[in-house]
Amino acid sequence: MHDDTVDRTTNGTGKVKDKTLAEIKQLRLKDKDGQLTEHAVPTLEEALLAAKGQIMVNLDKAYPIFDDVYIILRKTDTADLVIMKGAQPVETVKREFGSYLDKVIYMPVVTIDEEKSMKVVEDYMEQLHPVAFELCYRNVASPVPAQMERRLAGKSLIWYNTLWASLAGGHDDEAARKDPDASYGYLINKLGARILQTDSPAFMLDYLRSKGWHD
């Protein structure tokens, strides 16, 4: 479950921690517009098996339970399709999960408005060489995103989250509806983004295909 309660995402009410798995499995999921669907709430294992061989899965709220998640990844043989992520320094991540970091895809999340952000990236590059970094920034005038593009070019992929303006310097899904070149195009061409997290996948795909950037 994404939330602490089941109210927003299902036809139930109450806190997740107060319910049994059997009770949660009786609930039906809502779609992104809040409309009820025929789908029940899956367990993580069920969701991973459904995704296996089809898509990658971004577990963005799993950091506190990575050890439990890793057991399920091994059971389902899905470690290669799950992105495990967190905002902690590399020393903390290695101390807590070092026994299996080489067996999973771990992506650091770095808020590059912070002064220490370049050091955080440098430490990760030196010690873990992540396949990608999720970079977040609010300050539209910040020079750091361009610096990050130069530092990571050819070494690690850059991921930006376009769900909200505060995560990508104003270059979000809403802005893209008015001017996709100034939003998605800017992140790709100017800041080196190769992965974009969006709530508007169909719109984004149409844009990317119009530019010849997607099959």
Label each region the model flagged.
Residues 34-38, 115-215:
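C-terminal active-site rim and adjoining tail of enzyme catalytic domains
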